[in-house]
Amino acid sequence: MAFKKKFAPRRKFCRFCADKELPIDYKRADILRDFITERGKIIARRITGTCAHHQRVLTREIKRARQMALLIYTATHSSDVKKKSIL
């Protein structure tokens, strides 16, 4: 017996297509942080809802921001933080 979904999932939309004035720039780290995890990984477009074009641009700008040290490459491990606090 198959169960029907009670509701349809909300369709995701590209934030940058909806707002043409919103720039994707490596200097705008506050916007770029919305598209990376707390561990520093880039979130997939099927999760964020961005279109293919803007996901490519977003990935390029995140990588530029990492090189300029505006964003982190990876998060520090909690075990590393504990070791430093003991010493």
From Swiss-Prot:
Pfam families (alphabetical): Ribosomal_S18
One Gene Ontology CC term in the entry: cytosolic small ribosomal subunit
Disulfide-bonded cysteines: none
InterPro entries listed in its UniProt record: Ribosomal_bS18, Ribosomal_bS18_sf
Record keyword Membrane present: no
Any one GO BP annotation for this protein: translation
GO molecular function: small ribosomal subunit rRNA binding; structural constituent of ribosome
Gene3D superfamilies: Ribosomal protein S18 (4.10.640.10)
Keywords, sorted A to Z: Ribonucleoprotein, Ribosomal protein, RNA-binding, rRNA-binding
Subunit architecture: Part of the 30S ribosomal subunit. Forms a tight heterodimer with protein bS6.
PANTHER family: 30S RIBOSOMAL PROTEIN S18, SMALL RIBOSOMAL SUBUNIT PROTEIN BS18M
Family: Belongs to the bacterial ribosomal protein bS18 family.
Role description: Binds as a heterodimer with protein bS6 to the central domain of the 16S rRNA, where it helps stabilize the platform of the 30S subunit.
Protein name per UniProt: Small ribosomal subunit protein bS18
